[in-house]
């Protein structure tokens, strides 16, 4: 198998993992809005597992590049420039990966904002409860 063929296999596997992660981040939004803490913990564990899978695929990709005499931090764009075959498929995969990563990143920002709003709401309510239970001092 050529470098590009092996790389395409790894990138497709990473893409599938990222799709699953993306689905979880969208599901996480609904769980945060519903304030379902136990489900949030479950989904966070699933996210961690997927992130670990991605890390393993990245190590596999780095080993592949090393075995082909390339630096492990070489970009897909550089590989596309240097190799004649599989350029089109690598370009498509690169774009899909970039778009998916952007989507995950933006959804995570939304989720973080929702969590922050929930924390502020809880803090406000705790202060309200505390202030109504504390007798006034004169």
Language-model regions: role of each:
Residues 78-138:
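Short terminal interaction segments
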Residues 1-81:
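Extended, charge-rich alpha-helical scaffolding segments
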């Amino acid at each position: 198998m050529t470098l590009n063929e092996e790389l395409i296999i790894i990138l497709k596997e990473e893409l599938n993992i990222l799709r699953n992660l993306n689905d979880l981040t969208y599901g996480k939004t609904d769980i945060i809005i519903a304030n379902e803490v136990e489900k949030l913990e479950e989904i966070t564990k699933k996210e961690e597992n997927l992130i670990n899978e991605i890390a393993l695929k990245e190590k596999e990709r780095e080993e592949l590049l090393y075995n082909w005499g390339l630096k492990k931090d070489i970009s897909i764009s550089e590989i596309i420039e240097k190799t004649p075959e599989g350029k089109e498929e690598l370009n498509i995969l690169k774009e899909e990966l970039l778009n998916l990563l952007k989507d995950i990143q933006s959804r995570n920002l939304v989720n973080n904002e929702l969590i922050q709003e929930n924390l502020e709401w809880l803090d406000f309510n705790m202060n309200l409860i505390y202030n109504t239970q504390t007798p006034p001092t004169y």
